[in-house]
Amino acid sequence: NVRDIKPGELGMKTFLDMAWDIDKFDFDNINNHQVDFLVSIFGERYREDIEDVMNSYYHLGFQHKPEAMGWGYEWNNEHVQERMTDTDFSFINYNEAEGRIQEYDRISDKSEKIWNALPESHKAAFYELVFYPVKGAALMNKKMLVAQQNRWYARQGRTATNYLADRVKSYHDSIDYYTDKYN
């Protein structure tokens, strides 16, 4: 059982096209393949925005995949519960965490603008191929990074910890909402 192919459809299309004719691909054009496919569905007028969104999405994902943002989980240990540890993205040095959140917000907003502008007949496909992966990655990063910031604030005894905890819960609930629409 290979499960649902929906989340792997775009990558599978690229892989199968490469298997069919590898000579069409090289270092300079590989990034354009998915954009060309998406533009063939959603329209040439969205090329620049789709290219920007997808390039940033893959760049951020290469730095760290959103589904592994909780990479500090300690499994099978002496603790009663698994413990979440902080990511390597810093809130102190070079605005790493904030910059990551801002970039995900930027591409998430851009993908939502495209989705809103599309005709109804194209919205489901765009939601599956672009909007949901980008929005989900943005929300997962925000959830995990704001939780990290919350733990930092709690160690300092700041009263803002309750506010941050509410934001984390909101991001979690938003992931559930968008996932329900995706499925």
Q: Where on the chain are the PLM-derived regions?
A:
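Catalytic domains of carbohydrate-active enzymes that cleave complex glycans
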Residues: 32-183
